[in-house]
Amino acid sequence: SIETLIPVSEENNQIEIHTQGGIVLPARFFSEIVKKLADEKITIEVKDHFQTNITSAKASFTINGIDVNNYPNFPVIDSNEVITLPTALFKQVIQHTVIATSTQESRPILTGVNMTIKDGKLTAVATDSHRLSQRIISIAAPESQLEKNYNVIIPGKSLVELSRIVENQPTIEMMITENQVLFKAENVYFYSRLLEGYYPDTNRLIPASSSTQIVLNAYDLLQATDRASLLS
């Protein structure tokens, strides 16, 4: 679930509210209508029986809406337990891990990214049983928050969508409950359910020591594998 707010108090938004209220509109129709409007100013007016007029310059559309009271409420998440992350860094974590998530729904637990928070570190792990990717970063959180440990599995598709939505925001806040996670970036609220179950212990798949260590130029390695993949 995604919730986006447009603050009326910000002068650049140039929003005028004549009457407070709410309406639920068909997402596809509303999105296509807004894309086709030529003028920058849009007026939305809700009439009887939830009929909604959308006008801009000489264009006018009327679509049927639904009572906002029938729309499901967003889950209430305790905002006192907040983990703050640099947006650019967290997007890197997503990029480096979701590539290893499974696309097979037969093992739904592997379609997510296992995120654990312990001792001021966030560890993100993903595997489809053939590939494994892990990223560890330091996190900023209140002292009381650092004493708590978290172990959650977030759907990979949700993280991909989140990465697309948050762009220019400097930081992103993460709040975790028993079965939900909320990401907040300025005026965007992104809710996702958590996958239920136990993630495989991937620590056993990463050797603690090795007898051989190879250091390679990253660019040269990528070029070589790219050429070799032509015949795979």
Predicted region positions:
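Aromatic- and glycine-enriched pocket-lining scaffold segments that form the walls
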Residues: P108-L122
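DNA polymerase sliding clamps and clamp-related checkpoint/processivity subunits
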Residues: S1-A100, K121-Q169, E173-S232
